[in-house]
Each structure stands twice: as structure tokens, then as C-alpha cells.
A protein has these predicted regions:
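A short SAM/SAH-binding and catalytic strip from SAM-dependent methyltransferases
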Residues: 99-112
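A structural alpha-helix within SAM-dependent methyltransferase catalytic domains
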Residues: 26, 49-52, 116-120, 147
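Conserved Class I S-adenosyl-L-methionine
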Residues: 46, 167-264
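A short glycine-rich, Lys/Arg-flanked "PGG" loop and its adjoining helix->strand segment in the class I
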Residues: 113-128
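A short acidic, Gly/Pro-enriched loop at the edge of an enzyme's catalytic core
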Residues: 89-100
């Protein structure tokens, strides 16, 4: 997996909709208050703090592959809250967590078969996963714009061996993955969370963090701003609505699964 470095503070300012989805996801879980919780791709740590508040007699650990994200997250202090710089693909926990949570992060992980195996291993008996991430059809406008842009003559040479940064599966595709792991029960839902950004500035903040990050990494410094401006111009032109808002398709996949009980 290729890792990318994000600006934690800029992401915090641009991730209003991700936080809304995350709080909705947290509200779905019935906490006892003493769980050990792992947050995969914790980002700026705001949602991990909400998890910590939900388990006053438990613990919440947030992990992220971005140093800057973890630095931002570590400005949040709770006695039962910890953040660690760790690539999700390299986690090696065993029988440690009652809940593995993730919001708006796991579409950055390419190998979900291994992710599911590692997560199953990390859960205690009867432990649960609760994930929400980009699914099939997510960010359709941006993906169309960026795919055309990186194939243009001025930029194509920098993307010859480029590894696409996201994995956004359909419900059927993910059902095939999870059914092979051994969870005692699981539910997969596809969700339409299409969004109208209130103005151009709001959409641009989202384009900058996180959408453009993996593509700007490929381009020489002297071309980065030109590339950025061209993408932004095309996105605003393509997505502007008559009322001055800007539309993007957000299609989510939500995963709930429970590990089997211990066999005696």
C-alpha cells in the first residue's frame, strides 16, 4: 500500500460531512461503556475522542498512517484515549478489542481480504466491527475529472505506473470477501450520502484535502499548482448547481460484523 501524507488541520476544516457520517455511525452502536475500541484511520482524532467518551470505563486507540494526522490527533487529551502512528496494513493485534470502528478511511486500503483477517484476529470473542467507507460510485464527478486529467499529454508521463489510491467495492463484492472470514454474523448496506457543498470554497477545501493529495505526489513541484487549478476549475464547472451549491456523489458501504464466541 502506498501511504500519503495529509495536513491534519486542513483536513479538520474540510471534513464536515465525514464527521456527520461518523457521528451517525457511532450512534448506531450500543455501548456498555467498558469496551476496548480501535479506530482505523483515525485522522484528526475528533471521532476517536467521541468513541473514548462513549466508553468511560474502557479505552479508545486511534491509528493512522499519516504522521501529520496523528500529530493533530495528539492535541486531544483524554485519560482513556491514545493515538499511534501505524499503517492499518501492518497492524498485528490479537484478541484485544471489543469494537473495531472506522469511518471514511478504509477505501484507502487496497487489500480488504487481509484487512478483514487482521481485524478478525484483533477482536476478542464476540467482538464487532463497524465500518463505513467509500463504495461503488463514490465521488463519481471527481474521479471522472481526475482520470481525464492524468491522461492528458502534459501529465500522463507522471502516471505511467501509477497505482490507483482507492478501493471502492460494491455490496456483492464485499459480501464475497467477508463471507470467507468466519464472522458469526454480518450485515452490509449500500448508502447514498450525496452532498451539496454550500459554496465553492467548501468544495475546494474538500478537493485539496484529501482528494488531490495522492495525485499531486506524482507531479513535479513546478507543475503542482497548475494541475491543482485545472482540476478545481473543471470540478467547479461540472458540479455547480443553479442555486450556487456544488454537487458530488457520495456512495457509502457500511459493514457490521461479529466474531464468533470462543469454543470450549
Amino acid at each position: 500500500m502506498v501511504t500519503f501524507e495529509f495536513d491534519g488541520e486542513k483536513y479538520k476544516a474540510a471534513s464536515k460531512h465525514q464527521k456527520e457520517w461518523g457521528n451517525d455511525l457511532i450512534s448506531e452502536f450500543s455501548f456498555k461503556g467498558n469496551e476496548a475500541v480501535l479506530d482505523l484511520g483515525c485522522g484528526d482524532g475528533v471521532l476517536t475522542e467521541q468513541l473514548a467518551l462513549s466508553v468511560p470505563r474502557g479505552t479508545a486507540l486511534g491509528i493512522d498512517s499519516s504522521v501529520h494526522m496523528i500529530e493533530t490527533a495528539k492535541t486531544i487529551h483524554r485519560n482513556n484515549l491514545k493515538f499511534t502512528h501505524l499503517d492499518i496494513n501492518k497492524m498485528n493485534f490479537e484478541n484485544e478489542f471489543d469494537l473495531i470502528f472506522s469511518n471514511a478511511a478504509l477505501h484507502w486500503v487496497k487489500d480488504h481480504k487481509q484487512l478483514l483477517k487482521n481485524s478478525y484476529k484483533a477482536l476478542k470473542a464476540c467482538g464487532k466491527i463497524l465500518w463505513d467507507f467509500g463504495g461503488f460510485g463514490n465521488c463519481a464527478n471527481f474521479i471522472d475529472v481526475i482520470q481525464k486529467k492524468i491522461s492528458e499529454h502534459n501529465y500522463a508521463q507522471y502516471f505511467k505506473a501509477y497505482e490507483w489510491p482507492w478501493f471502492m467495492p460494491s455490496k456483492k463484492q464485499y459480501m464475497d470477501f467477508i463471507s470467507a472470514i468466519g464472522f458469526s454474523s454480518y450485515t452490509i448496506k449500500e448508502r447514498n450520502k450525496d452532498r451539496y457543498f454550500s459554496n465553492a470554497s467548501e468544495m475546494i477545501r474538500w478537493i485539496d484535502q484529501p482528494c488531490l493529495v495522492p495525485f499531486l505526489k506524482q507531479i513535479p513541484q513546478e507543475l503542482k499548482e497548475t494541475f491543482r487549478q485545472e482540476v478545481i476549475t473543471e470540478m467547479l464547472k461540472r458540479t455547480q448547481q443553479p442555486d450556487g451549491t456544488y454537487f458530488e456523489a457520495f456512495r457509502r458501504i457500511r459493514i457490521y460484523a461479529q466474531k464468533q464466541e470462543e469454543t470450549r
